[in-house]
UniProtKB/Swiss-Prot annotation:
Protein's name according to its UniProt entry: Light-independent protochlorophyllide reductase subunit B
Pfam families in UniProt: Oxidored_nitro (PF00148), PCP_red (PF08369)
Top enzyme class: oxidoreductase
PANTHER family attached to this UniProt entry: LIGHT-INDEPENDENT PROTOCHLOROPHYLLIDE REDUCTASE SUBUNIT B
Function: Component of the dark-operative protochlorophyllide reductase (DPOR) that uses Mg-ATP and reduced ferredoxin to reduce ring D of protochlorophyllide (Pchlide) to form chlorophyllide a (Chlide). This reaction is light-independent. The NB-protein (ChlN-ChlB) is the catalytic component of the complex.
GO biological-process terms attached to the record: light-independent chlorophyll biosynthetic process; photosynthesis, dark reaction
Organism: Huperzia lucidula
Residues holding [4Fe-4S] cluster: D36
UniProt remark on cofactor binding: Binds 1 [4Fe-4S] cluster per heterodimer. The cluster is bound at the heterodimer interface by residues from both subunits.
Molecular function as annotated in GO: 4 iron, 4 sulfur cluster binding; ATP binding; metal ion binding; oxidoreductase activity, acting on iron-sulfur proteins as donors; oxidoreductase activity, acting on the CH-CH group of donors, iron-sulfur protein as acceptor
Amino acid sequence: MKLVYWMYAGPAHIGTLRVASSFKNVHAIMHAPLGDDYFNVMRSMLERERDFTPVTASIVDRHVLTRGSQDKVVDNITRKDKEERPNLIILTPTCTSSILQEDLQNFVDRASIISDSDVILADVNHYRVNELQAADKTLEQVVRYYLGKARRRRTLDQSITDVPSANIIGISTLGFHNQHDFRELKRLLQDLGIKINQVIPEGSFVEDLENLPKAWFNFVPYREIGLMTAVYLEKEFGIPYVSVTPMGVVDTAKCIRQIQKHINNLAVVALEETVDYEPYVYQQTQFVSQAIWFSKSIDCQNLKKKKAVIFGDATHAASMTKILNREMGIRVSCAGTYCKHDKEWFNEQVHNFCDEVLITDDHAEVANKVARIEPSAIFGTQMERHIGKRLNIPCGVVSAPVHIQNFPLGYRPFSGYEGTNQIADSVYNSFIPGMEDHFIDLFGGHDTKEVIMKSLCTEKGVIWDPESQLELSKIPSFMRSKIKRKIDKFAVHNGFTKINIKIMYAALICL
C-alpha cells in the first residue's frame, strides 16, 4: 500500500463492487473500516440512477477489533438476505481490512447455511491487483460459479441459438461511456442480423448466466473487464470471442470482419449459408460515419502538424493513438497507459503509431512528460485535464477515471460508427481553444491583461519583472506558455533568478 494524491485505477474492492452493483438483484457486503465505504456515494453521484447502490458496509470498529468480525459479518449477510432477497451476496474485504487476516471464507460458509441467497467471497488478492483486475476476476468468478451450479443441477443447455447470437461481456457501472457504447453496439449487432443473447454484468440476473453457452460468440469491447470470462468460456465451452474494440473506422471494420469469420464457422452447418458484411462496412464507412470525410477536410488537414499526448486505460489509449495517427494524420508524440499489467499488449498495439510509449501509474511522471513534449493537445483522463489546465494545453477526456461531466445524459458513444463522429468532434474541439484564446486577446475580449504564469516543477524561484511580463503579454496566448517555459529554463540554466527584458530577448534568440 502507498499514500497517493491521485490513483488512476482504484483499489481492488472497488472493482468487485462495480461488478456486483452492475448485476440486478445482487448485493455486496463490504468488510471495511470507515473511510473505505465511499463507493455508494461515488456511484450514486456519477451514475445518477434511480435505484440505491446495493452495497452495505460491515464496519470494522473497535468492538470488532476486540471480539472479531465473524458475528457481525454473518449477521449483516443474513439481515440483507431477509430484507433484500437477493439472488447472490458477495462479501469483499478492502485492502485495509485484509490486514486483519481473518478467515472470511469460513464466515461465508457459515452464512450460506442459514441464508436463502447464494453467498460467495470475492476471490481477489487485495494487495496485488487494482480495480480493473479485480473487476475482471470477480466477473469470471461469478460466471464460473453459476455455470458450475447449473452443471451440478443438470440444467445447463449448451445448444446454440437458431440464429446468430452474441454475449456482450464487460459493460459495467462506472465505465467510461459504457451505457452509450452498449446502445451503439446493440444497434451494430442488430444491423448485422445478430441477436444479443446476454449482456453481462450490467442489467443482467445471475440466474440467467446459465444461458451464456447458447451464444455463437462472445464480444468483449474492453480489455479491462470481461477478457478473463471470455477466455474461460472459450476454454470450457468452445465459444470463440472477439476482443477487437470497435473504435475508429479501421478497427470497427476489423471487428466486424472477425465477427463475420466466427459466424461463418457455424453458419455453414447451422444455416447452410454464409454471411457477407463487406457491403455493410462500405455503406457505413462512406455514408454514415463522417470521420472519413472529416479526415480529408481542410479543418483536419490543419491538424496534421500538431503534436498530441495520449494517456488512459489500455483499451481507450491504444484506440485513440491509432485513430489520431492512422485516420487523422496527427503526430502522437507519446502514448501511455496506467494498466501496467497489460503493458505487453499495449506496446504491441501502439509502437508503430507514436514516438514513445509511457507505462506508469504515477501522475507526476505523466505531467512531466507532457511539460517536456509541450503538445498542442492532450487526450487522457480527469488528471490529464488538470495537467492541461496548469500548462494551458487543451485536453480531451477519452478514458476513465473521469468526473461527473463525462457521464453525460445525452447520447455520446465512443464505439461503432456513431462513435467515430463523436471522437472526431472531441479531437477537433480539443485543438481549437488555442486559436480562440488568441483571437479573444487580439480583439480585446477580456477585461484583464494579466499574464497567467504556469509551470510544473523546475522553475521555482524565477521572478519576472513588470516590464518583462508586459512584453510577454504581447505574445499570442496559444504560444505564450510554451515560450515562457523556455525562457524560465534558460534563466535557470544560466543562473538568473530575475528575468528582465534583456534576459528575455537573449533567451528568445537562443530558442
